[in-house]
Amino acid sequence: MKRKFWWPILLLVVLIFGGWLIVSQSLRDNASQQYEKTKVPTLFLHGYGSSHRAEEHMTQAIVKAGVTQNVIRATVSKDGTVKLQGALPQSAYNPLVEVEFEDNKNANYRQNGVWLKNVLVKLQKTYGFKKFNAVAHSMGNLTLAYYMLD
């Protein structure tokens, strides 16, 4: 009698565990397919007094999630000159660009907007980008807004 009692419980546990495995795998597969592969770069703009290090956590998480494998950095000097670090292969999809302003405490947002334009011109000349996405924090939002105003 005791032996017959355990079989249904064991069967129930196996079914629940098997169902959980199937559902979790399905959710994982769906999560990896929730993005679109494009050639459009996403620029990350840091906040006041910050640097590319603040952006690295986000870009590394995106790479770890499998959305892209391509991250470069655009460093803007105090005179507005842009230097690209790293390179994007032609096959790159969903490329990420960490934008770093060396003058990271410049409160002249109009100037920062011009410097962002310099970054975009450099990216366009180097890679032919015509569109971009942006993720910005604090001063980065104002920089983006002033770029769009000019």
Where do the PLM segments sit?
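N-terminal Sec-pathway targeting helices
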Residues: 1-15
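Membrane-interface motif at the C-terminal end of an N-terminal transmembrane signal
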Residues: 16-32
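Soluble periplasmic/extracytoplasmic beta-strand elements of cell-envelope proteins
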Residues: 44, 96-100, 133-135
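Active-site catalytic motif of lipid deacylating hydrolases and related acyltransferases
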Residues: 49-129
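Gly/Ala-rich beta-loop-alpha elbow adjacent to hydrolase catalytic centers
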Residues: 135-140, 144
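Primarily recognizes the serine-hydrolase "nucleophile elbow" in alpha/beta-hydrolase
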Residues: 148-150
